[in-house]
Amino acid sequence: MVQRSDWYVRLFSLDVCMEVFVASGRHLFTSESVSSGHPDKMADQISDGVLDALLREHPKSRVACETLVTTGLALLSGEITSEAKDVDYVNLTRNIIRDIGYVDDAMGFNCDTCDVKIFLDPQSQDIGNAVDDNPEEGKSTGAGDQGLMFGFACNETGEFMPLPIALAHRIVNRLTEVRQQGEAPWLWPDGKSQVTVQYQNGRPEKIHTVVVSNQHSPEVTQDAIKAFVLK
């Protein structure tokens, strides 16, 4: 079996990626998914909410919004170019946090009492000069940021995602569903799941390990949590 250190080194080279999967024989692969109340996911949803609100009013808005979330604080910063005038960033942020489920100080975060700081400035005019529509050419001339991404689809699941991450997503999505439906009122918004799948010659062979971690109210017992999650 390929050693884990060798596994990670070889994955950086795309031309041997499939060779590693096929030649490594039996190996374990773990993926993690976090719920909507995890700080990283909260920050993503707030930044997405800012973008959506601006695009609804001005479809040509350019938004570079970063969000930091920590206990009792949501901080938004970045640069924005938009003709939208009616976006209330503070209330928008509080409503997103409320929808996630943070409505009680006991959870360590409360949509109504948390501090929301806004540091959103106009985008540099130098960037605007480079990317705004050019009337002489009748088209846009560039982008304000650049990125190079790659990925692939696989046939392990119906959503064309690798089995470990697909299963981890399903678990945290189900936890969120039962919490929002009131089936488990002791569940709080922050949670995560890790799923380890054993592969044989590049194909899923069996589920090796499942880890589920979730915030909860202090009165619920560990035995009750375990029985509920297993069910």
Task: Describe each PLM feature range.
Residues L11-L14:
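Leucine-biased recognition of intrinsically disordered, low-complexity hydrophobic segments
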